[in-house]
Amino acid sequence: MTIADNKKAFFDYFIEERYEAGIVLEGWEVKAIRAGRVQIKEGYVVVRDAEMFLIGAHISPLQSASTHVNPDPVRTRKLLLKADEIKKLIGKVEQRGYTLVPLNLHYTRGRVKCEIGLAKGKKQFDKRETEKQRDWQREKARIMKGDAKD
């Protein structure tokens, strides 16, 4: 079940590979995510010391969050992947033009997971071409639907 999608990632990048990673969360964060108070649009993934971290994801704390915990909505969260996956991704990210972006948050067997994508940035003309393709598909569907009624 999807919790939050990053539609901006699909508009700004060509997604070449996808990986599922666990996230190290605090208790108040899990409660807030279950309540749907999460946004990953501004998030990105970095590699530090052979570990991966999700930066810029915003999890708004609930009003009922404990007073003895100081919630930080945009703290850096560690991503959990297998060592061989991390090594493979480090090699790819070091190549020119590749980056890691969070694509969505979802549940797998009751646990919150983050799908990350190995992505290459789109140029402005690529974005325009994608938009034209989407408009043409929509127009084609409209024409076919009109033909079916006649």
UniProtKB/Swiss-Prot annotation:
Keywords: Cytoplasm, RNA-binding. GO terms for molecular function: RNA binding. It is found in: Cytoplasm. It comes from the Bacteria. It holds the Pfam family SmpB. InterPro entries: SmpB, SsrA-bd_prot, SsrA-bd_prot_CS. CDD domains: SmpB. Residues 127-150 are annotated as: Disordered. Its main location: cytoplasm. Belongs to the SmpB family. Required for rescue of stalled ribosomes mediated by trans-translation. Binds to transfer-messenger RNA (tmRNA), required for stable association of tmRNA with ribosomes. tmRNA and SmpB together mimic tRNA shape, replacing the anticodon stem-loop with SmpB. tmRNA is encoded by the ssrA gene; the 2 termini fold to resemble tRNA(Ala) and it encodes a 'tag peptide', a short internal open reading frame. During trans-translation Ala-aminoacylated tmRNA acts like a tRNA, entering the A-site of stalled ribosomes, displacing the stalled mRNA. This is SsrA-binding protein. The gene is smpB.
